[in-house]
């Protein structure tokens, strides 16, 4: 009979913290019920005491979930989380792994608050009583089940299973060459006891059709509204045979470690497909659809693939590699990791430590139910291997399948460690699969399972004794550290300075490179000295301030800080190469200190040896209290979407509420803001200019043209940020940063451009497409001041008349302020009766509708680069404008 874990209400104490989840979690019946063998003849006779003991151990030590301040102002601010989790994609969405040593401390079953999390967007708020799962498609009896019906009417299975993100250990790949995925460390795996309804029972109840009638695939769809592919649900599919195979233990899970699912893990119901990658286990399950074709969700095709190493993003799109079925990932591959020694651990070498062996430990797993049969460790680069002791706490199912990780250990003589440069591990499973020696790069950074290598180095002598320091390949997320990072920095240094030679005794960087602390970099945050940190390198950007295309603010807003994530989000490869000209040194990430000032990281007791300073997780700066101005150049501010109005088929007016209703945005006229969002696991930042007046209190408006996918042949994927904004629901939070820009209109013809004053009586204003918004902002400020007599002459280009933004406002200004404001439209194609220009911006149009060049005229423009380069600049020069000094480009 299926095991039970004790009667309980769903609103429960969860590991010491009351978890109400902001919803009603109470079912209409207790979860405990026994099933006779006749009603569960396809199920295992689970050992109830075995499962109870697993759950008891998992919950024996408190791992609290709390309201993390880092979630304040996001759509997930109601979700309780463990503060120790290492965040991999900034504040939101929540993608995180446990610190590796904390994960290993709990052993076989992972406490829920420490279970890794992969979210593509906000966590849906769910109610047990209202939630339904629809079964539809190629079934005889389409049905919508409530949660109570699923629990009451079907037998349940309960068993432990290890979940692994396909991106586990991805950061190692990113250190070789950047993939399109974020930096998972080696703790993107966890194990829980799951309880749920076998999916095959539900499909049989609904009368799933045969293969001959087209029922070839079973698709699972979640509740989230996500931006991928122009807006879609998270969905994926498996074959009909897999779904109906009793040996695979595929369930619709509603309990984890004896409790209802946590919000981050899919409350109230999710898929569990043991032995598969986590990406196939849809959370917040809403629909199961039996189909003839694979799932059509964007995330089924554009995620969880291992493409050949030569395929880059452009080739993948051009040649349709995403849609080739042979590259999809389903079952996990064989993998293993060294967890002891931990990163930066110090093993002192003395008469006591050398008398006993050091125990190297780690975990291993495989997919498809294949048992890990052997783990081996080498101390000499693979010349010889030592077979490890295996610990399999799991009982196989009645088909002999193993769904969980195992643990391995090996006793090594300390003197052998002293003589080696690295420890490496590989595992084998019962299919005789093993791990490759070298990393195999792929575009998505998936399924990395090369030998896991820990480097060893001898510490500097202290009081006549020495020690061994161990170094893992990487640290998760944007945390610094790891031998791969140091070797990469060394290679880059050698490329920049060929005279430097790599040390033959250590992978550490050449000591000739100048090192700076974070506190030292922080001091350089002004126009007189602007330093930044990117990927552990320190750059002095002071001399580039005046040349930066985005103006000095773009650098000063991040001066004195580590801006790696933001730099990568908005800069091209060309810009990244240019940055190398400004590198002055490296960031100090570890250092040797006295034992009195640093905790002992060794698992072998106290010592008087030098210890490496631990790498502490960077904590988020607490939000500033409400004040008169919302924008803070040093901080992202969370703003709530309060309204969204459709102006046309692809134009939306978004209104965002500021953190305090009595705040001004604080955006000078002429400057812009960055919208920041994590999309498909990567930070995306785009510059926008609000159309609302700078004097508005409590909110700001953005007029956005949504660039949908499959509309423009040159941009088949459409606009990343605009489609993300389109997908946002009312109440969603968005991070805003600024002000940015090198142009500021200070009133009555006066401008500040890169810190220098300029004046004009007449403005030649040229805009293309959405580039009208900064022009509009300046014009709005001028016309609000009756004593500002600056003349504005606008030429505004678009593809069609329907694409003209803010036309009603522009025409009203031209009518009511005809002496100060004039506008001329140019469209590529026109309808009959069109009274303005047709084609492109030409010299003739500009001479007719713009002021002549003079000492009191300035030109300003914003639009597509080709328009500025091939129309605006050459024609202004023909008109006598000094485009170097008299043309302002937003």
UniProtKB/Swiss-Prot annotation:
User: Any idea which UniProt keywords this protein has?
Assistant: Disulfide bond, FAD, Flavoprotein, Heme, Iron, Metal-binding, Molybdenum, NAD, Nitrate assimilation, Oxidoreductase
Q: Which cofactor does it need?
A: FAD; heme; Mo-molybdopterin
Q: What class of enzyme is it?
A: oxidoreductase
Listed binding positions for heme are 548, 571
Q: How is the cofactor bound?
A: Binds 1 FAD.
Binding-site positions, Mo-molybdopterin: 165
- Name all Cytochrome b5 heme-binding domain ranges: 513-588
Provide the FAD-binding FR-type domain boundaries: 634-746
A single GO BP term for this record reads: nitric oxide biosynthetic process
What EC identifiers does the entry list?
1.7.1.1
Q: Which SMART domains does the UniProt entry name for this protein?
A: Cyt-b5 (SM01117)
Q: What does this protein do?
A: Nitrate reductase is a key enzyme involved in the first step of nitrate assimilation in plants, fungi and bacteria.
What the record says about family reads: Belongs to the nitrate reductase family.
Which proteins does it associate with, and in what oligomeric form?
Answer: Homodimer.
Q: What is this protein called?
A: Nitrate reductase [NADH] 2
What is the protein's species of origin?
Answer: Phaseolus vulgaris
């Amino acid at each position: 009979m299926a095991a039970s874990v004790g009667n309980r209400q769903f609103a429960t104490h969860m590991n010491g913290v009351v978890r109400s989840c902001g919803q009603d979690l109470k079912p209409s019946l207790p979860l405990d019920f026994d099933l006779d063998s006749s009603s569960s003849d396809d199920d295992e006779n689970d050992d109830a005491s075995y499962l109870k003991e697993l759950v008891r151990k998992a919950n024996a030590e408190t791992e609290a979930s709390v309201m993390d301040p880092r979630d304040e102002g996001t759509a997930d601010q109601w979700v309780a989380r463990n503060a120790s989790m290492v965040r991999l994609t900034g504040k939101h969405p929540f993608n995180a792994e446990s610190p590796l040593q904390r994960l290993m401390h709990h052993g076989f079953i992972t406490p829920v608050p420490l279970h890794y999390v992969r979210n593509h967007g906000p966590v849906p708020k769910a109610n047990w009583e209202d939630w339904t799962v629809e079964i539809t498609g190629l079934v005889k009896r389409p049905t919508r089940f409530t949660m109570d019906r699923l629990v009451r009417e079907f037998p349940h299975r309960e068993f432990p299973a290890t979940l692994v993100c396909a991106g586990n250990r991805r950061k190692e790949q990113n250190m070789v060459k950047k993939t399109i995925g974020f930096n998972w460390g080696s703790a993107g795996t966890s194990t829980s006891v799951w309880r749920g309804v076998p999916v095959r029972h539900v499909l049989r109840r609904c009368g799933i059709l045969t293969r001959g009638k087209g029922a070839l695939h079973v698709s699972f769809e979640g509740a989230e509204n996500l931006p991928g592919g122009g807006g879609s649900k998270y969905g994926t599919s498996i074959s009909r045979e897999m779904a109906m195979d009793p040996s695979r233990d595929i369930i619709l899970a509603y309990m984890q470690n004896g409790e209802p699912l946590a919000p981050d893990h899919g409350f109230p119901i999710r898929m569990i497909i043991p032995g598969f990658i986590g990406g196939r286990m849809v959370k917040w399950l809403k629909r199961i659809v039996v189909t003839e074709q694979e799932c059509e969700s964007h995330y089924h095709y554009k995620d969880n693939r291992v493409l050949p190493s030569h395929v880059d993003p452009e080739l993948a799109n051009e040649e349709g590699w995403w849609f080739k079925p042979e590259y999809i990932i389903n079952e996990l591959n064989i993998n293993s990791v060294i967890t002891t020694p931990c990163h930066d651990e110090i093993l002192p070498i003395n008469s006591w430590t050398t008398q006993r062996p050091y125990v190297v430990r780690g975990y291993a797993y495989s997919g498809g139910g294949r048992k890990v049969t052997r783990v081996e460790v080498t101390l000499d680069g693979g010349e010889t291997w030592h077979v490890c002791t295996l610990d399999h706490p799991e009982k196989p199912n009645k088909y002999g399948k193993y769904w969980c990780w195992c643990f391995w250990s090996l006793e090594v003589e300390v003197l052998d460690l002293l003589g080696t440069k690295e420890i490496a591990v590989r595992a084998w499973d019962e299919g005789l699969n093993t791990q490759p020696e070298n990393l195999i790069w792929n575009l998505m950074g998936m399924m990395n399972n090369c030998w896991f290598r820990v480097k060893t180095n001898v510490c500097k002598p202290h009081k006549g004794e020495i020690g061994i320091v161990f170094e893992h390949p990487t640290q998760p997320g944007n945390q610094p550290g790891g031998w791969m990072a140091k070797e990469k920095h060394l290679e880059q240094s050698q490329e920049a300075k060929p005279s430097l030679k790599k040390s033959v005794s250590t992978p550490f960087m050449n000591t000739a490179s100048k090192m700076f602390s974070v506190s030292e970099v922080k001091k350089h945050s002004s126009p007189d000295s602007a330093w930044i940190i990117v990927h552990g390198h320190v750059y002095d950007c002071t001399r580039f301030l005046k040349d930066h295309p985005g103006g000095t603010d773009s650098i000063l807003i991040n001066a004195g800080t580590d801006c790696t994530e933001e730099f990568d989000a908005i800069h091209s490869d060309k810009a990244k190469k240019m940055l190398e000209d400004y590198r002055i040194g490296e960031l100090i990430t570890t250092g040797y200190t006295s034992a009195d000032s640093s905790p002992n990281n060794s698992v072998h007791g106290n010592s008087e040896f030098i210890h490496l300073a631990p790498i502490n997780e960077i904590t988020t700066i607490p939000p500033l209290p409400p004040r008169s101005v919302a924008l803070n150049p040093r901080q992202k501010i969370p703003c709530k979407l309060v309204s969204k109005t459709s102006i046309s088929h692809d134009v939306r007016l978004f209104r965002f509420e500021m953190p305090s209703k009595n705040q001004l945005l604080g955006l000078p006229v002429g400057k812009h803001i960055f919208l920041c969002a994590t999309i498909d696991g990567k930070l995306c930042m785009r510059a926008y200019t609000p159309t609302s007046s700078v004097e508005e209190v409590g909110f700001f408006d953005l007029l956005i043209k949504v660039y949908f996918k499959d509309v423009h042949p040159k941009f088949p994927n459409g606009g990343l940020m605009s489609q993300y904004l389109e997908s946002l629901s009312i109440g969603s939070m968005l991070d805003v940063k600024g002000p940015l820009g090198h142009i500021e209109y200070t009133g009555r013809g006066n401008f500040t451009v890169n810190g220098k004053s300029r004046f004009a009586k007449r403005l030649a204003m040229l805009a293309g497409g959405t580039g009208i918004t900064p022009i509009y902002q300046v014009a709005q400020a001028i016309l609000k001041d009756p004593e500002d007599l600056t003349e504005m002459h606008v030429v505004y280009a678009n593809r069609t008349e329907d694409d003209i933004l803010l036309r009603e406002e522009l025409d009203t200004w031209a009518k009511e302020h005809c002496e100060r404001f004039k506008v001329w439209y140019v469209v590529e194609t026109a309808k009959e009766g069109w009274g303005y220009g047709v084609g492109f911006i030409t010299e003739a149009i500009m001479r007719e509708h713009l002021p002549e060049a003079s000492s009191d005229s300035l030109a300003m423009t914003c639009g597509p680069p080709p328009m500025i380069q091939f129309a605006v600049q050459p024609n202004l020069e023909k008109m006598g404008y000094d485009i170097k000094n008299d043309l302002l480009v937003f």
